[in-house]
């Protein structure tokens, strides 16, 4: 089997697929998976399946489904089912805002989804409404609990730290995670571009991480992006995601992205090096041609942050 390796020696094992740009939330900080354009085109389930089959033949074995909000797709169960059955794919997961998760968790598990990440930045309903534009805090919490019961484990809660809004809630979120058998991911506010929103709400989470590290009984450094995970005394796991101006994060990135309209995207932070794989599928390209497109996309990868922007 071929192994995809870029010019910097990074082996690509993960494809992150945005299945839609649509979302029922309006989170003011959302980076939209780096898609800085509006597209009304979406891939069909069989088109995603074919792309993932090609990816699997090149050694990619992990698939993350994202959006937008993936549960807005009426055919999301079919998408999960098709992808989970592909030989060589051994991990299929999803990032969701959790609003519809209570209704979908059991069907997603039966279709082959293994685990979920759920976005939840606050335990305060009013703050939640301010961040998302939706009165949906209780629905998301119920979705998280249902995901645990459906055995979509580990269930990870993604908490983006926003200056002046939720820095003081980390300890409460750790308790929530511990009480419900969750992993907490503390995430630095990231953005493909530095704008007024970023300047207003971005905060360096190093101080928070230092505090949690001192409380931990064990530290694990993950191979993916060299993320640090801390095990606390009650066995609660807290992982830190610090992408901005972080050369270690970039140098150990093992993923490629597929946009909702079928373009291979080598880097979250760049939009000038996309490859339109869906367009060629719809023109009748064979699998060998699609493999060449993957290889070309991998060759376009370079660490965005490496002692500054390369």
Please tell me what each predicted stretch does:
Residues 19, 184, 262:
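Residue-level signature of catalytic and energy-coupling elements of molecular machines
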Residues 192-306:
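Accessory C-terminal segments flanking Radical SAM cores
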Residues 34-38, 124-131, 193-198, 276:
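A short acidic, helix-capping loop that chelates divalent metal ions and anchors anionic groups
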Residues 7-46, 267:
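Canonical Radical SAM [4Fe-4S] cluster-binding loop centered on the CxxxCxxC motif
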Residues 45-65, 69-185:
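Radical SAM/AdoMet-radical enzyme domain recognition
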Residues 1-16, 22-26, 205-219, 305-306:
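Flexible, acidic/Gly-rich N-terminal and inter-domain linker regions that tether
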Residues 158-160, 185-189, 222, 240-241:
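Short, conserved beta-strand edge motifs with alternating hydrophobic and charged residues
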């Amino acid at each position: 089997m071929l192994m995809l390796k870029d010019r910097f020696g990074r082996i690509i094992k993960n494809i992150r697929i945005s299945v839609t740009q649509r979302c029922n939330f309006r989170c003011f900080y959302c980076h939209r998976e780096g898609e800085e354009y509006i597209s009304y085109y979406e891939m069909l389930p069989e088109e995603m399946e074919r792309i993932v089959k090609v990816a699997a033949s090149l050694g990619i074995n992990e698939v993350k489904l994202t959006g937008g909000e993936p549960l807005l797709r009426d055919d999301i169960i079919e998408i999960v089912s098709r992808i989970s059955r592909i030989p060589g794919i051994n991990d299929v997961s999803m990032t969701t805002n959790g609003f519809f998760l209570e209704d979908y968790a059991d069907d997603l598990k039966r279709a082959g989804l293994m685990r979920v990440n759920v976005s939840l930045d606050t335990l305060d309903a009013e703050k939640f409404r301010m961040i998302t534009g939706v009165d949906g805090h209780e629905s998301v919490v119920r979705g998280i609990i249902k995901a645990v019961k459906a055995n979509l484990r580990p269930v990870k809660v993604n908490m983006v730290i926003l200056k002046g809004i939720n820095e003081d809630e980390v300890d409460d979120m750790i308790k929530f995670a511990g009480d419900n058998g969750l992993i907490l991911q503390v995430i630095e506010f990231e953005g493909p571009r530095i704008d007024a929103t970023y300047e207003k709400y971005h905060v360096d989470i190093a101080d928070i991480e230092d505090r949690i590290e001192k409380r931990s009984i064990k530290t694990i450094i993950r191979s993916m992006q060299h993320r640090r995970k801390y095990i606390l005394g009650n066995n609660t796991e807290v992982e830190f995601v610090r992408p901005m101006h972080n050369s270690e994060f970039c140098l150990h990135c093992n993923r490629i992205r597929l946009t909702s309209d079928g373009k291979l995207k080598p880097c979250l932070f760049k939009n000038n090096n996309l490859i339109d794989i869906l367009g060629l599928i719809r023109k009748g390209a064979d699998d060998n041609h699609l493999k060449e497109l993957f290889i070309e996309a991998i060759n376009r990868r370079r660490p965005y942050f490496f002692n500054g922007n390369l």
